[in-house]
Amino acid sequence: MGKTLLKTKKGKKVDGELIFCLLMIAVPVVQFIVFYIIVNFNSFLLAFQRFNGDMADVKYSFAGWDNFKTLWIDLTQTTNMRSAIKNSLTTWFFTSVVGITIAVIFSYFIFKKGWLASGFKLVLFLPSILPAILLVAIFQIFVDTIIPEVLNVNPLFVLGEGTAFPAALFFTVWFSFGTQVLLYCGSMAQISPSVLEAAKIDGVSPIIELWKLVIPEILPAISTFLIAGIATIFTNQANLFGFHSTYALEYEGEATLGYWMYAMTKKSEQNYPYVSTVGLCCTAIALPLTFLVKKALAKLGD
């Protein structure tokens, strides 16, 4: 197929396909520059600034390393920041390690067409197509109203202090299965039937088949979720904002680091410099860790 050539006023011919391609990539490139590079560069600058004035007249001035000193004091002398980090690591463990393990087992059960496999697939995937805030409302009504009435027990108080983080963590893990199960089942469907048939003839048990045959084949899909989990280890707010808005900050030891940063920026613009400092430090830890995990998983898959 010949190229489309446009003739300019000076008689020069311009490749029309090249112009079309440039126009198509212009929008995403501009979006990347504005909403990623510029925004993150501004966040980097805020880490070295302090808030001056009031909300009617917002001003920032250079603060040097003062925000980093404040962060060090919070880490060493207070418990709120350490509790938030602990909750973030707990969230990562249950969503990335426990959650992925359970999702792989459920996917294998569905792949082998076990008892009620189609029903499990529907139940696990259906929540992922509903808005998160709707799922939060349904979960809260179910736990605090329906279960106490049916079982004649006291409400579990999802919004209460002491149960806010465990309830949000359970919700996050439970409703994160859908996308994983769908991808794992799709990857398992690509496994050659002859390989599985040969394993069956050789008398391979389901556990060995899962460990030796299935998991190596779906490792790229598993790696994707593991890498994403590491990359968001400090920014995952575990749906706490959906349950509590910014009020969970008032509860002792209930916030994750991701929720703390999000809620602090929602509360006041005065918190921007300190939150930017925390975010910059988290990036300095998570970025190399993400690349290391990615490299390790790539070697494991070779």
Please give the residue ranges for each predicted region.
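Short, Lys/Arg-rich, polar N-terminal cytosolic tail immediately upstream
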Residues: 1-15
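A structural signal for multi-pass alpha-helical bundles of membrane permease subunits
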Residues: 14-302
